[in-house]
């Protein structure tokens, strides 16, 4: 085998060994065994919230172990592919060598993607995520853009078999949404999606403009970790104002004949959370409370970071303003303004193919935090 190819394979094997060590593959197997025992308990579904958490964590752990084991097998198979190519002659040898090179390149990409998972070591990175999208400047185009972003993230979650729970959708009058809040129920969803926080900019020919003029629209994305009991985010009833109303759909159309939608106002901070997608008022209140607790946790951590930055004489780093540009006209390009990562296929990106942006963002964040 070519010495350069041997060196490439050895480097990939070493990287994968590091990934296996960081992920604690043996511990992962033990965790799967315990979760399987818990999932087999016939009484588990008496607590649906707990059952969903167990099954989601089990599925994620099984998929993670399967990915690592498949990568290890592919690393071990790669030298065999090159040996088989060396035994061929003429065009067959050339074709077999090209196939081995293609597998080497693909394996490098897949191992690097798995390596990114080991970078998710922040305090809340392993949590599930609550995502809120709000339309910004740009009128009806911005509302349509906010809905396109919501679809993009939901499609991404679906492609990874991550359950999504929509808490609230506030529809705009003509098209699109004013805002939406949903949860992605998967381990490490917060650590992965938190790099999406910021302002997303769309440039396109407006489908709502009779003169087909180019329009720039903005939408803001907020990503929060789901709060757990260990976070001790207690909200006394005396700090809440609870309003109920009828759920509404696109164009303000009522979709419920009872006052099941809930709006929570946290009086001390002025934070407002609404939820209307559950069937009952109680379910909507519980869901709204989960989102409110996530926002209060984020506010608490933001205040702590601000105090630390003040002590350090550091203005702090903000994700605010533009972080990614999606250009559909006059050319086609999606570019992250922090990482410089770009893709010339906006249709695929808007259909949920954002793993490249997520991986680049996670690496960028870790480099920034190390500086």
Swiss-Prot record:
GO terms for cellular component: cytoplasm. It is found in: Cytoplasm. SUPFAM superfamilies: Release factor. This is Peptide chain release factor 2. The modification N5-methylglutamine is found at residue 253. It comes from Mycobacterium sp. (strain KMS). Coiled coil: none annotated. Methylated by PrmC. Methylation increases the termination efficiency of RF2. It comes from the Bacteria. One of its GO terms (molecular function) is translation release factor activity, codon specific. Peptide chain release factor 2 directs the termination of translation in response to the peptide chain termination codons UGA and UAA. It holds the Pfam family PCRF. Keywords: Cytoplasm, Methylation, Protein biosynthesis. The keyword Cytoplasm applies.
